[in-house]
């Protein structure tokens, strides 16, 4: 998850990162 988050952060697409984590947690 952190790797994807990191890659998305580099693209400055934090929303996608947050959405990915949210989906993974099932919230």
Curated annotation (Swiss-Prot):
PTM remark: Contains disulfide bonds.
pH dependence as annotated: Trypsin inhibitory activity is stable after incubation at pH 2 to pH 10 at 60 degrees Celsius for 1 hour.
UniProt-listed GO biological process terms: defense response to Gram-negative bacterium; defense response to Gram-positive bacterium; negative regulation of endopeptidase activity
Temperature dependence: Trypsin inhibitory activity is stable after incubation at 90 degrees Celsius for up to 2 hours.
Subunit structure: Homodimer.
GO molecular function, one term: serine-type endopeptidase inhibitor activity
Miscellaneous: The monomer may consist of two smaller chains which are linked by at least one disulfide bond.
Biological role stated in the UniProt entry: Inhibits trypsin (IC(50)=1.25 uM) but not chymotrypsin or papain. Has antibacterial activity against S.enterica ATCC 10708 (MIC=5 ug/ml) and S.aureus ATCC 25923 (MIC=5 ug/ml) but not against B.subtilis ATCC 6633 or P.aeruginosa ATCC 25619. Has no hemolytic activity against human erythrocytes. Is not toxic to mice.
Protein name as it appears in the record: Trypsin inhibitor 1
Keywords: Antibiotic, Antimicrobial, Disulfide bond, Glycoprotein, Protease inhibitor, Serine protease inhibitor
């Amino acid at each position: 998850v952190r790797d994807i988050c990191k890659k998305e952060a580099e693209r400055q697409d934090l929303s996608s990162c947050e959405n990915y984590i949210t989906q993974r947690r099932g919230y």
